[in-house]
Each structure stands twice: as structure tokens, then as C-alpha cells.
Amino acid sequence: MNSEASVFSNMDWSQLAHSLHKKANNSSSSTTGAFPQLTSFTKPTATNGVDSPTSSHIDPSVSAKLDSQRKLSLKSGNMWDSLNAPSELTSKNPTVSSTTSSANPAIVSNGGSPFYKNPVVANNPSSTFDMSTNLFNSKNANTSFTNAFSNEGISPGFLRDCFPSSNSITTGTASPKLGSPFNHINRPVLDRSPSSFSQSRSAVSGNMNPGVGTLQQPQRAGSDTFPDLNTSSSNQPGGEPNVASANTHSLEILSSSAYHPSGSSNGISAGLTQSVASPVGQVDNLADFSQSPLRRGPSRFPTNSNVPVGNSMSIRDTDSPLNILVDKAKAKASIKENASQPVAPSASQREHSAVNSPAAAMSPSTAMFSSEAFPQHLASLIPPALLHWLYKDPQNNVQGPFTGVDMHQWYRAGYFPLGLPIKRLEEEEYYSLAFFIRQVGNQLEPFLVPLSPVTVQNASWNAQGTDLPLSNYLPESSEQNRGGNKHLELYPSTAEVSNVRNDESKANSLSEISYNQQSECRSSELNVNEDSANQKEESALGTSDNSDMYEKENTPIHHNESLNQLSKDLGSISLSEETKQEKPSKLKETVESKRLSTGVQKQSPAASKEIPVTSGSQTTAPKPSPWKSLPPKHLPSLDETISREMSIASSEALPQVEKSNSDQPPVAIPSTSKTGSPWAKVSDVSTSMAQEIQRMEKQNENLKSKVASNPVSQTSTNAKASTPALASGSIWGSPSVINAWANKPAALKSPLIKKNIQQAELAQNKQQSSVTTASPRSNALNANTPKAAAPSSNVTMKNVTSILETSTFEGEDTWSVVGPGGKIVNQQSPSAQQTTRSPSKVSATLNAGNSQASTSSKLQQVVSMSGHSPDFLAWCKISLKGLNEGVNYEEFLDMLLSLPAENNVETFEIISDSIYANSTIMDGRRFASEFTRRRIADLTGKDGQQSNNKSQSELGNSSGAWSQVVRNKPKQGTEWNSAFKVVTSKKNKKRV
């Protein structure tokens, strides 16, 4: 019940209307001049109206009935019945007309003329009414100004709702039951929105009002298919016998082109909206749900055989409050541009809606915006006022953000060209305005179209088949057509990862699996041949034609299982911290492989045999792939370069060992078969690290046995080990030399290896001649020194290490001190010039046993070779506890002992600066003075031991030392003002 209905039902209008009616008939009444609107409201005039000259007299025979009927009619809201003005129009054809009012049946007979002859609706677009409408005349003679309804802009919809009897179509609305606002009103039925004022609400295209539209009853077609419109009669019992003739619900008004196939004589075209009256006995038989305005469409009347369902025009329920929502949805979706291309739901939604929704039987326009088929995704659309836009001006400056309303105003004003780069604030890439218009399908107001939220993939504009560049969305059909190949799109290509190493990370993703698999295949001793690799590559790339896509649906499942298995196996790979290289892991997958024959085969470091590997899971050979990738270009990696250089260097350094080793039958190497990553092609490796390590171990074993059997060589080695660890010209603080290679070879730089190996060859030749020149004191000291036992693993690359330890770098000249007169004063013997230097670039980690052995041996070397007493060394150890963490005490003390044992400025500054550089809590100057004093005192009391060490005595007392050069210089003044000349003043001199 609306508000107007409550006003009409609760107020007693009979007294007011009766008094107004009397005053309106009196020409001298002041009401006419004071309230002209009420005059025109209560006294409508027309050509044949109530107050017209032809019908101003009311029949006295019915005046008694009018008093009782007037009160009931006014109470129900039908004001025209109280004024004896029948508000309903009859047909222009008198043969079809019926009794118009139950209150006054004598006014119009079946053969008489109606009160309103030839009623039409005025063609007035300003929402006012002409005299022919018999409602409100804006140019009435009694009104001194314009009608108030016209001034206030009252819409036709408001007049129709407030005064329902003024727009009724069928007969019999004089009854208070039918004329009251509580009943349904028969109105024109079109598929247009009630809010669209410019659209015609009537199918009559003549002089009908496009705003209101009043339809007339058509002429009977003479067919027995339709019910009789004039079935009611005044003689029927019940007080209101003709009520049923017009009690039809408004939604039962159907239109069909089959109503009048041959047209009608009254000028109304075929297919016009009809008002079909149901028979008397069938009015109350309709179910309540069929009368509900929420139930829309032709499915409302599936059981009513008397109402034909037309196909030319869809039913429109103007009484339903849902029409407002539907109209808003039409405006949002831009029905004018997109009516032919609605948003297509998914296949499952279409199938479900086609089976279960009543809207499936509707016409396309009705089913598109019906309540059952309303698109659910419209609820998440963002209105234009909340959309934020950015655009780039001609100077490529970003402007914004602006709302969609502002962008629309500027677009309609012509400021935006079609090539303007625009984007939403949430999007990443710009696109042209023309592209945006094509996407929304609305050129007039593209910025007013509600848009969906921007996702991570920027798929707000992307439907299936669009070519938006900022989209990562793959259409469903493309995914289905790809079949078993769609999972391979994210995999890295073979050319990208063929020579890439990822040693420090475990296999947690597909790319890491590819990298680790490639590293394993490189470090293994198997080399997969080209044919097998091509087969595995074709199998991995989903090698099948488009016709066989659905036959290989198990291919991605198989690959996923293999990937999971590979990830589990790769997770167990242990990485060595010392060498940063992988161990070849054993895969649990069953693999059939051919192994190396046990015959005599010489393995060259430049090339190795190729072993074909056949995967057990690959039972049938796949078809050749049309997308077969090009063979990757082989680039030598770091491991290959190192292994090649090591093999060449070792073969040159030890030719005799290589020759003796070649005579022995090699042990059959067990080949560990590997299944590489299915998408990566295994590249051939020239020399594997495992083979190099095994061959080096054999060579070192032979060398060890050969050296152990030769006592002369052992003596020379001991003599070399007895020399001072560091000389005056060597670099102190270098890392200690490795004694053993733990499990993997260290990554040595190839230029350093070449240089050291070349010098090692010369050093081996000099070892034989240098044995006889060794001092007996060194042999005795070396014999008394306990030798550290080498661990069992100290066999790998021992020869190379020993050569590096005892090698002499001849390319670097020793230091020569130039004395007075340009003479070299510290010329040493050739045996003394050959000093031992440790390589500074060798990186390794010693185990606990080796560290303890090297520490004890170095301490003993310091004690034995420096000539200092243990008391002095103990004081040095206690005093140097304040060194920073990470500073090696032995190396630092060895560096201090290599300095001249003299109390001069240079030695003092070097010691103090070294203390300041390696400690934050020690006093460098105090330690330098105390260290020099104690050292000189210790050496002067040990003359016998000092004479035994020739190199140390030359270092401290040689005339060619730095102290000898500095000693000849004149002594500089130590006063603070030594640079200035002091001038005494003359006392007796007078000033002028």
C-alpha cells in the first residue's frame, strides 16, 4: 500500500467534495477566483464533459443512488465517480461498448453514445493534458495562471499513480472495488522502461501521448479463440455483476501478432497491446503466485488456456518494484550498445540456467535482464566515481589520478584524442583510449561504464580471445588444446640452462631442478649420446601432433611424478663447503644403462667414451616434435676449464708416472647411470672431475712409493723443509699450504697452475744437485724434529703440493740493498737466494689433525731457526694475546722475528704499526720498545746458537742491511725546534 492509497482510504472526502461541488456550480462563489486549481481539479471540462452544455444535467432517476455511492467512491479514492463523471473510456466502436458504470447504468446503454466521444490522448511532450483528455486543462478560462501540475513538473507517472482511474483502460472502473488504489490497474504493457520518458508507452503511433499512453479496446476479431469482452450484464446478481469484466490483472494483458491477422477497422495495428477480460468463473481460480509481480515473463500463465501467449512482444510488468533495479542494470551495462553481445557466462552456468531457469523460455532481451538470469558478477563492479585514471599528456607527463566522472567530462568536451595513453591506478601498463573504447564497447561514455577490479594478472579487460598486451590469461580452449604440453610453458629452455650452475641452492623449484640436474650430468662420468638426448628432449616437450593431444593426457602426470622424484633425490645431495661442488647422487628411478667394458682402455683427458642411456620409463619412441629446439651451443664452464688445465699440467709435470700408469690395466670404473631433467639436453663434458681425481690418486700413490724407496730424495725433501718458513722479502700473513685434498680438488686458477707446474719441473732437476750442498746442521735439526704423521687421506695431489711448497719463483728477483757508492752490499750465495714461498692464492681448509701437526711443526721451526730462547718466545706469546680475532699468532711472530734485531727508528715504527693494525687494545709503541730490548738481550746472550744460523746472523749483522745504509747519514736534531735557527738579541745595539 502506497502513501497516496493511505491518504485516500483514511480521509473522508465526501463532505469536502460535496461542498466544493456546490460552490463550483455557483458562479458567484469566491472559491473560483481564490483557488482556480481546485476549480479545474474538481470540475474538469471537455467537449462532452460533465460541465459541458450537452451534459450538465444529471438524470433525477439516479440522484438517490449517487449520494450513497459518492461517499463510498470518494473514500476509496475515485473522485470522478463522486462527481458523476465516469472515469473510464469506452471504445469508439459502439458495438463493442458495455456499461461503463455500475452506479449509473442508465447513462450509457449498449446502443447509446458514451459521455466521452472519440477519446484520444493529446500529443503534448511537456507532460500537460489537453481538453480532449477530460483531466486537467492548462488553458481553462477560469484559471488566471498556468496549471500548478504543469508548473511543478508533475510527471505522467505521478498522475497515473495518484489518480489511477484517470488512466484506466477497461470498462467498469466506476466500482469502488475496481477504482480503488488497492487493486491492480490495467495499464499498457510494453518492454520499455517506465523511467525512459522519451520511449513511447503505447503501440499506437498516431497522436498518442508518448508520456502516458491510453489504449482503447480493439475490435473483436470475430474468432471464437478469444473470450467475449462484453460478458458482463447489469442484470447479474451480486450487486456488482460487471466487476469480473475488468478484474483482470495487468500482466494478463498480452500482445500477439495473431490477435488481428488482417488488422482492425479502428486504426490500431495488429500486435497491439490488448486487454483481455477473463470469464466470470475463472477470475478467482488463478493461483496467488501467478498474480505476484515478482514472477515475470510468459511462465506466469502456463495453465491459463484462455490467454494466448504471443511471440512478437515480451511481457513487461510495470507494477513490479524490481523494474527499477533492472533499469539500473540496463543503464550500467550500456544496453544500447551491448544488447546484442551480453556478457557470456561460462559453459556450466549456461547449462544450469538453461535447464533450471524460467528465463530460458524468454526472448533474448527479457532473459538477459530478468531476475533469474541477472549476471552475478555485476555486484563486484566498481562505479565510475570510484575508478581512478591516469593518462600521459603530449609531453609524456603522467597526470592524475582522476575519477571516471571527470574523465568522462573531459572526454565529452573533446580534450582526449583516441591515441591518449591511459590506465587505471591499479594497472601497470598504459594503453590507448581507442583500445579501451573497443574493450568496453561504449564510445559515447566509456568512462562511465562500471569496471571489474584489477587483479594481479591485469585481466580486467580480458575475455577469451582478446589481445591485451598486459594480460597473462590463457583462454580455456587454448589450455584444453594444449593437452599435455601446457605444463611445459613455465619450464626454462635448454639453451638457457645448459651451462648454468646453481651449486649452492637445493632443488625447490623447476628451474633449480634443471640447474642441479645439469650440474650432476656434467660432474658424472657418463656422457649421454646425442640420439638418447634427442629422444628424451622430444619426450619432455610433449611431442605429439594436435590430433594426438587427448591421447597423451597422462604425459603431464608422468612428468610431474618424475619431477617430484627428482626433487626428492636432489634434496639429498650434499654440497662440500671446501670445494663447492656436488657429489653424484644415486637416483632411485630404475634406469637401464650400458657400462664400460672391463678391457684395457686408456682414458684420455681430452675426450671420453660416449655411453648411450635408455630410460626405463620410455617404452615407445615418440613422434618427432614440430617444436624441436635447436642444439645448445656448448660453452666451456669453469669446471671444464679447471679440469682440463689440471690434466694437462699433471701430464706434463709427471711424464714418467703417466707412462708407468699407462702400462697398468685400469680398474673398471662403475658407471652411475643418471636420468637428467626431462626438458634439458645433456651437454657433453670433455673431462669429468671424477676421472681426474681417480687418476691423480693413482699417480700420487705411485709417486709416494717411488719417493719412499729413494732415501736421497727423502733427504732433500727434509732439507728443504728445514729452511726458514718466511724470509725477509716474502709476503707474511699468507694462508698455510694445504697438505691434502680432502675429497674434492680445490678450484685453482689455471694461470697459477701453469706457472707453478713449469717451475716445478725445473725444481725437480735441481733437487738432485742441491742435496749435497745442504748443511749438516739442518739435517741434524730435522732429524731431531718429530715429523707429523700424515693422515690416510693425504695422498691426493701430494706431488703437486710438495712441488708448490719447494718451488723457487725465478721470475721474481730477490731484494738487493744498495749501499754507499751504488754497490750491492747484501749479495748472497745462490743457495741462500733460493727461498721457499707459499702460494698465496691456494684456498683450502685443513682438518683438525693437519692443523695440529702444522702448528706444532711451525712452533718448533720458530724455536729452532730463530735462535731465541723459549723464555723470550713465551713472553711474546703472552704479550701478543691482545691481537684481533683471526690474526694468526705464529705468522705474526714469525714476521716480527724476520725484522732486523736492531734498535733503530725503522724497525721500531714497523713493529708499532703492525701492532696497531692487528690489535685494538695493545700499545704498539710500548710493545715495540720492549720487544726490541728483550730480543737484543736474548740474542747477545746466545752467541753460540746465533752463529749456527747463518741466515739469521746475516739478517741482523750484515753490513748491507738497511741499518748500515741509514747509519752513515748525519744525525738529525730531535728537538721540537730543530728546523728553526735561534737568533740571540744584541743588547748594546741602539735603535734609530
Curated annotation (Swiss-Prot):
Q: Where is the composition biased (Polar residues)?
A: 25-58, 75-104, 214-237, 301-315, 337-348, 474-483, 507-532, 596-606, 658-676, 707-721, 825-859, 943-966
Keywords in alphabetical order: Cytoplasm, mRNA transport, Phosphoprotein, Transport
Under the heading SUPFAM superfamilies, the entry gives: GYF domain
Record-level GO BP terms:
endoplasmic reticulum to Golgi vesicle-mediated transport; mRNA transport
Query: An example Gene Ontology cellular component term from the record?
Result: cytoplasm
| Comp. bias regions, Low complexity | 193-205
Q: Which Pfam families match?
A: GYF
Residue ranges of the region described as Disordered:
24-105, 172-245, 289-316, 336-359, 467-486, 496-563, 576-637, 651-682, 697-729, 760-794, 818-859, 940-992
Q: Its function?
A: Has a role in mRNA export from the nucleus.
Q: What is this protein called?
A: GYF domain-containing protein mpd2
Tell me which species this is from: Schizosaccharomyces pombe (strain 972 / ATCC 24843)
Q: Which gene encodes it?
A: mpd2
